[in-house]
Design a protein with these regions (language model features):
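Conserved phosphate-binding elements of NTP-dependent enzyme cores
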Residues: 1-942
Length: 942
C-alpha cells in the first residue's frame, strides 16, 4: 500500500501541470497568497477526485440521488484514501438544525431523558410516575408495615362540577358497593345528593385489605384489585393507608389534574423535529414569522396619501382596496394628508389592527359596483392574509423580507417542545435547560450528575458518549456555544470546527480530511486547543490536508506546500515544500520569508489619537453585561477577545443597527441598550460583510464595482460601435440586443441528466463569450467586450492604464489583493473573503467626504501574510481620508497595527461580555487580565 498520495499533471484552474507527492498519515499544510491555487489543489483536485471515485462505485440508481462530481483536470492520482471535506461554505441554513442536533449530542440526551427522566405535571409540578401492576404490588409490600389496613380506590371524578347521578348508577350496575365522595366513604345504594354547581372528587372503593407479607393469597387478591381499579379509572389507583393517599398510575398521569397525561417517555417525544414532542404552535422551530407593524410604516414624515404607510393591495393608490381604505379613514376621522408621525395613536391602532365597527362603503367601476357596510381588519391582518393565501413563492419571499419578523413563540417561549415534555427533568433540569447552557457548563452538569445505582447502570454508555462529544467541542474552542444555538447563526469557522469535533467523535481511521482554514474566528488562545485536536485526528491514522495561513498552524505541521509565486496566472506552481524548517530556509518562498521574519507587517511608528467618540451606554444583548463603551472616531479601532466573548454582539448586533437606523434611515433591530452619544460626529455607516455580492452567475466584480458601466461606455464610443449604431446598452449581457440569446448572456447552458449530475456546458452558439456575433465585431485596442471580461484584474489594470478614472477603480481591486480574479468572474464562485474585499474596493473607489464609519468582521479571512499587508495599507488609507474603521479581528498582525483596541471577555459565553482592557496595542500588551495582551506582547517585539 502506498505511503504517499502521488498527483501527476494537475491542471485544474490555474495549476501549471504540477506533480505533487503528499505523505500519508501526516498533518500537511497548503499555503500561498490568495489565488495561488491552494483550493484548486486541495479541494478541486484531491478531494474532488476522492469523492468522484466513491460515487462512481455506486449503482446508477443511487447516483441519480447523490449526484456526481466532475473529473478534475489531472493526469493521475495514486494512493488516494476515502476523502472527507470540512469547509466553511457549507453552513446549514435549516432553522431546525442546532449545534446539539448536528453534533448528535441532542440525540443522546433524548435517549437519556427517555430512560432516566422524571416526569412532572406541567401545571402543578407533581412528580408523575408510571408503574406496572407488578411494580405497584412490590412497592406496597416493601413500603408498608405488615398488618396495615388499606383501602384500594379508583379515582373516577377529579374536581368536576355536577350531580354525577348517572355515574353512581353505572357503578352500582358494575357491582361496586362503596365510593369515597369528597373524602367521605358512602354506600352507592344510598341517595347521594351533590351540589351541581360545586366541584367534586369521587373514587370507587375497589377493595379493603389487611397487608400480609409473604401471603400468596393476599398478593393474588391485591393484584386483581389493582387491575380492576385501573380498568375503571384508565390506569390510575389510590392506596389509602392510615388516612394517607398514595397515588399510582400505569400512565404518566397527574393525581391532581386528571385531564393532564404525559405520553410514554420515548426518545422521539423529546425531538422538536417530530410532531410527538414539538410545540404545536411553532411546529418545533421556537420562532414564528409575524408581520412587523413598524415595517408597514415606510416613512413617518410622509402622509398616507404620499406613501408613508404600506397599504396591502393598494400600491397603485386606486381601485377597490384603496377606496375602501379611504372610506374607513373618513369614517373614523383619520387625516390621510398629514405626516404619519402626527396621526394620534388611537387612530394608528385602527389603521394597523382594524376595528369591529362597520362603515358605509360605495364603490363604482366598469366591471362592478358595491354599496353596503364593510369591516376593516387592519393592514397587519390584511398583510398576513395575503402572505398565507398566496401560492407564489416569490410573493411570499418578498413579504417575508420586507414586512415580517421572526418572534419568539408565545406558547413554548422559544423552547420548541410541548409543555408536558419540558416537565420531564433530570436533577431538576429539563432537556432544553441543559441545551441552553454553554458547552462548558453542560459538561460540568453531566460530570457532577448524581444517579441511583439503577439509573447509573442504564445511563453509563449514553453519558460516556455525551461527555466525549462535549469534550471534543471544548477542544476545538467552542466551549462558549450552547447546544440550542441554531446552526444558521454560526460563522463559517464555527460550523467548520463543529464538523471537526463530530469527525473526531466518529473515530474513523485511514481517512483523508481536507480542511479550509480551521483557525478562522479563533483567538490565539484557542488556537493551541485546535492544533492539539488536529494532531489527535492525525494520530488516529488519518491524513490531514489543511489550507491555512496561520503561522502557528504552519509551525505545527509535519509538511508544508507553498504555492505561487503569485496569484491567478502568476500562481499555480509549487514554490517550496518540506518541513516547516525547510520552507523557512527556502529563498524562493514568500511564506518562508514571513516565517523566518525577513519580511513582516510593520508596527506603525506612531498611533493616531482621537478627541471624538461614539459612546454606547448600557449594552446588554446576549452575554453583554450592561457595558458602556467609548469607540474613538477618525482612527483604526480593533475589537478583540476570545471566541464568544461578545464582539459581534456589541458591534454587528448592537452598534451597527443603531447607526444604520439613525444615519441611513434603516429599520434594523439592535439588541438591548440604554442610549448612544456622539452621532453628530458621523454622517453614515457602512458594514462591509462577507455575504455574496450577488446570487446568480450574472453578478461579477465588474458589475458590482460599476467598472463595467464605464467599460461599456468605452466600447460604445469606439469607431466600430458608432458605424453600427450601437449604444452602451448593446454591450450588456443581461438584456436583449447584444447578448447571445441561446444562453441569454450566461455563456454556459445547463443540460439536465437523469443518472448523472446536471452538466454545464459552454454555449455552442457564442462559445462562452456571452454576446452575439455582431457585438463581438466591435473592438477596443484589439479586444472584444468578452475578452475584457475574461481578463484578470492585473491584466485589466495594464490594459486600461491610459484611462485614469477606470485605472483608479481597477487599482483598488488590485490593492485589496484581488489581482488574480477575473473582471467577469461569477459571484457564485467567490469566497466570503473575496466578496468582502470587492465590497471594500467598491467603497474605496467612491469619492469620500470623510465622517463615515466602516465596520468589518474578520477581513483577513483567507488572506496570506502578504495579502494582509496590502489590506492594512488600504484600510489605513480609508482612515487617512477622515473616516473611522472598526474591525473585529483575531489576527495579531492586524491588531498590532491598530490605533486603539477594545478587548472584550475575559472568557466566552456567560463568562464574557465585559470590557477587559482598552487603549493602544502597547497598553493592551501590559494588561494582566487580557488574553489578547499576552499574545500581542510577543508580536510587538518582532
Amino acid at each position: 500500500m502506498l505511503d504517499k498520495i502521488i498527483i501527476k499533471g494537475a491542471r485544474e484552474h490555474n495549476l501549471k501541470n504540477i506533480d505533487v507527492e503528499i505523505p500519508k498519515n501526516k498533518f500537511v499544510v497548503i499555503t500561498g497568497v490568495s489565488g495561488s491555487g491552494k483550493s484548486s489543489l486541495a479541494f478541486d483536485t484531491i478531494y474532488s477526485e476522492g469523492q468522484r471515485r466513491y460515487v462512481e462505485s455506486l449503482s446508477a440508481y443511487a447516483r441519480q440521488f447523490i449526484g456526481q462530481m466532475k473529473k478534475p483536470e489531472v493526469d493521475s492520482i495514486e494512493g488516494l484514501s476515502p476523502a472527507i471535506s470540512i469547509e466553511q461554505k457549507t453552513t446549514n441554513k435549516n432553522p431546525r438544525s442546532t449545534v446539539g442536533t448536528v453534533t448528535e449530542i441532542y440525540d443522546y440526551m433524548r435517549l437519556l431523558f427517555a430512560h432516566i427522566g422524571t416526569a412532572h405535571c406541567p401545571v402543578c409540578g407533581t412528580v408523575v410516575d408510571r408503574k406496572s401492576v407488578e411494580e405497584i404490588v412490590e412497592n406496597i409490600i416493601e413500603k408498608f408495615e405488615d398488618r396495615e389496613k388499606m383501602i384500594i380506590l379508583s379515582p373516577v371524578v377529579r374536581e368536576k362540577k355536577g350531580t354525577h347521578k348517572n355515574l353512581f348508577l353505572n357503578l352500582v350496575k358494575k357491582g361496586f358497593v362503596r365510593a369515597r365522595v369528597n373524602g367521605e366513604i358512602l354506600y352507592l345504594e344510598d341517595e347521594i345528593d351533590l351540589d351541581k354547581n360545586k366541584k367534586h372528587n369521587i373514587e370507587v372503593v375497589i377493595d379493603r385489605l389487611i397487608l400480609k407479607k409473604g401471603d400468596n393469597e393476599f398478593i393474588s387478591r391485591l393484584t386483581q384489585s389493582i387491575e380492576t381499579g385501573m380498568e375503571v379509572s384508565e390506569g390510575k389507583i389510590i392506596i389509602n393507608i392510615n388516612g394517607i393517599d398514595y397515588n399510582y398510575s400505569e400512565n404518566y398521569a397527574c393525581p391532581n389534574h386528571e385531564d393532564i397525561s404525559i405520553p410514554e417517555l420515548t426518545p422521539r417525544l423529546f425531538s422538536f423535529n417530530a410532531p410527538y414532542g414539538a410545540c404545536p404552535e411553532c411546529k418545533g422551530i421556537g420562532q414564528k414569522l409575524e408581520v412587523d407593524e413598524n415595517k408597514l410604516i415606510l416613512d413617518k414624515t410622509l402622509s398616507i396619501e404620499d406613501g408613508g404607510i404600506y397599504v396591502p393591495g393598494a400600491s397603485s393608490r386606486k381601485g377597490w382596496t384603496w377606496d375602501m381604505f379611504l372610506s374607513m379613514c373618513k369614517e373614523f376621522d383619520i387625516d390621510y394628508t398629514i405626516p404619519v408621525e402626527d396621526i394620534p395613536q388611537e387612530q394608528m391602532n385602527i389603521i394597523l389592527h382594524g376595528t369591529d365597527k362597520k362603515f358605509r362603503f360605495d364603490f363604482e367601476s366598469k366591471d362592478f359596483s358595491f354599496h353596503g357596510m364593510r369591516e376593516f381588519k387592519g393592514i397587519v391582518k390584511n398583510m398576513e392574509k395575503r402572505y398565507y393565501e398566496t401560492f407564489s413563492d416569490s410573493a411570499k419571499e418578498e413579504i417575508e423580507n420586507r414586512f415580517m419578523i421572526e418572534k419568539e413563540c408565545k406558547i413554548c417561549h422559544g423552547k420548541r417542545l410541548k409543555e408536558e415534555v419540558l416537565a420531564v427533568t433530570i436533577n431538576d433540569k429539563n432537556i432544553i435547560d441543559l441545551c441552553l447552557m454553554s458547552v462548558k457548563d453542560c459538561l460540568e452538569f453531566f460530570n457532577n450528575l448524581v444517579l441511583t445505582q439503577q439509573q447509573e447502570k442504564i445511563a453509563k454508555e449514553i453519558l460516556k458518549e455525551i461527555r466525549e462529544r462535549l469534550n471534543f467541542m471544548i477542544n476545538v474552542g467552542l466551549d462558549y456555544l450552547s447546544l440550542f444555538r441554531p446552526t444558521k447563526t454560526l460563522s463559517g469557522g464555527e460550523s467548520q470546527r463543529i464538523r471537526l469535533a463530530t469527525q473526531i467523535g466518529s473515530g474513523l481511521t485511514g481517512v483523508l480530511y481536507v480542511l479550509d482554514e480551521p483557525s478562522i474566528g479563533l483567538h490565539q488562545r484557542d488556537n493551541d486547543k485546535l492544533l492539539l485536536t488536529l494532531n489527535r485526528l492525525r494520530d488516529l491514522g488519518n491524513t490531514l490536508i489543511v489550507v491555512e495561513h496561520d503561522e502557528d498552524t504552519m509551525n505545527q505541521a509535519d509538511y508544508i506546500f507553498d504555492l505561487g509565486p503569485g496569484a491567478g496566472e502568476f500562481g499555480g506552481n509549487v514554490v517550496a515544500y518540506g518541513t516547516p524548517e525547510e520552507v523557512k530556509q527556502n529563498k524562493n518562498s514568500l511564506t518562508g520569508k514571513y516565517l523566518r521574519g525577513e519580511t513582516k507587517i510593520e508596527v506603525p511608528k506612531e498611533r493616531r489619537k482621537s478627541d471624538k467618540f461614539i459612546e454606547l451606554i448600557g449594552a446588554k444583548g446576549n452575554n453583554l453585561k450592561n457595558i458602556t463603551v467609548k469607540i474613538p472616531l477618525g482612527i483604526l479601532t480593533v475589537i478583540t477577545g476570545v471566541s464568544g466573548s461578545g464582539k459581534s454582539t456589541l458591534i454587528n448586533q448592537t452598534l451597527f443597527p443603531i447607526l444604520f437606523n439613525e444615519l441611513n434611515k434603516g429599520k434594523l433591530y439592535p439588541l438591548e441598550y440604554k442610549s448612544i452619544n456622539g452621532l453628530e460626529n458621523i454622517e453614515k455607516v457602512i458594514d462591509i460583510d462577507q455575504t455574496p455580492i450577488g446570487r446568480t452567475p450574472r453578478s461579477n466584480p465588474a458589475t458590482y464595482t460599476k467598472i463595467f458601466d464605464e467599460i461599456r461606455d468605452i466600447f460604445a464610443q469606439t469607431k466600430d460601435a458608432k458605424v453600427k449604431g450601437f449604444s452602451k446598452g448593446r454591450f450588456s449581457f443581461n438584456v436583449k440586443g447584444g447578448r447571445c440569446e441561446a444562453c441569454q448572456g450566461a455563456g454556459i447552458v445547463k443540460i439536465e441528466m437523469n443518472f448523472l449530475p446536471d452538466v454545464y456546458v459552454e454555449c455552442d452558439v457564442c462559445r462562452g463569450k456571452r454576446y452575439n456575433k455582431e457585438t463581438l465585431e466591435v473592438f477596443y485596442k484589439g479586444k472584444t467586450i468578452s475578452d475584457v471580461l475574461n481578463m484578470s484584474i492585473d491584466e485589466a489594470y495594464e490594459f486600461f492604464s491610459t484611462i485614469p478614472s477606470l485605472e483608479k477603480k481597477i487599482k483598488v481591486l488590485k490593492d485589496v489583493g484581488l489581482g488574480y480574479i477575473k473582471l467577469g468572474q461569477p459571484a457564485t464562485t467567490l469566497s466570503g473573503g473575496e466578496a468582502q474585499r470587492i465590497k471594500l474596493a467598491a467603497e474605496l473607489s467612491k469619492s469620500s467626504k470623510g465622517k463615515t464609519v466602516y465596520i468589518l468582521d474578520e477581513p483577513t479571512t483567507g488572506l496570506h501574510f502578504e495579502d494582509v499587508k496590502k489590506l492594512m495599507e488600504v484600510l489605513q488609507r480609508l482612515v487617512d481620508k477622515g473616516n473611522s474603521v472598526i474591525i473585529i479581528e483575531h489576527n495579531l498582525d492586524v491588531i498590532k497595527t491598530a490605533d486603539y483596541i477594545i478587548d472584550i471577555g475575559p472568557e466566552g459565553g456567560d463568562k464574557g461580555g465585559n470590557i477587559v482592557a482598552f487603549g493602544t496595542p502597547e497598553e493592551i500588551a501590559k494588561s494582566r487580565k487580557s488574553y489578547t495582551g499576552k499574545y500581542l506582547k510577543k508580536y510587538l517585539k518582532k
